[in-house]
Amino acid sequence: MKQEENGESGFGRLRGGARRAVRVSTQALVVTDSLEPGRTFPLVLRPAIEGLDLAAWAAANREEVERRLLEHGAILFRGFDVRAPAQFERFARSISPELLDYRERAAPRKEVGRGVYTSTEYPADQPIPLHHEMSYSHNWPTKLWFYCDQPAGWGGRTPVACDRAVWNLIDPRIKERFIEKKVMYVRNYGEGVDLPWQEVFQTEDRALVEEYCRRSRAEFEWRGADRLRTRQLRQAVATHPRTGDTVWFNHAHMFHVSNLDPLVRNSLLAEFKEDELPRNAFYGDGTRIETSVLDEIRRVYREASFAFDWQRGDVLMLDNFLASHGREPYAGPRKILVAMAELYTNAECNRED
């Protein structure tokens, strides 16, 4: 382990005793570590003293946490006494007081606290590919936190990837094509296969859905009694607002029909046209994205990824520009919670008039 090298002030709390402020160096409170020798992504922070209050320490050392996050892209807080969703929420708010609601959903989640949700409630036997949270939307969270309330009995690891590495691994010709054309997402709600529009937009009022679409520059079309189609032209890459890093930032490989299990894909294509599928991705001009190109993106993510086993009480903090995340299949109960903060607005996709 390597000791934290700079900073002062923090707060310690001994188990069984009253909380008290302690003026000590950060070195004495937290040490840096790694999940394997030589690996700095994600950075691992552990308490150097028993009973350290993570939320209080983070509040007192917020600038240092922010600096580390921008440097590494991901921080795993391990060994701290975080044992309940309320403690997790308190820690997240110590960094970003205003947590975000989950709107324009792509997956089912349940809210378990103010701004705290279950992670994607997707079938346990299916993997979730690496992705940036809400990169299909007109705005997205800058910061993410994942909290392990209960690790899976088997599997359920979370792969993460440093997107500085991902960007460097992608063929320049693919980058150029996507930068020029961008990505068009087509979603069809009300087919009984994917999420209903009422859950995605968190309302049953059509007028509110239409207003949301107009403001986010998304085309919409009501089809029949309770069906909705949206088309959204979105970015393929993004630039970090603080570091200036350019990163691959889209959901094309996840929304595209090639991401489906072959049996499911063939069944859907036998019933629907490609633009009538529950979700699909095209180039921004409406032309098909080559499956071979998306397979290359998936290969790059696999090459850049690193998966770790959860321990109860772990908190993983991600910069949503600099790190992507996924989920491996699992068996048995598993409870991972998520919080999001600091909304980034894509000016090209937001209408103020």
Model-flagged regions — what are they?
Residues A74-G79:
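Short cationic amphipathic helices and targeting signals
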Residues I49, F80-D81:
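Short glycine-rich, polar/acidic loop-and-turn segments at beta strand-coil junctions
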Residues L100-H132:
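A gly/proline- and charged-residue-enriched helix-loop-helix capping module
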Residues R67, D81-V82:
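An N-terminal structural lobe/cap that precedes and organizes the functional/catalytic core
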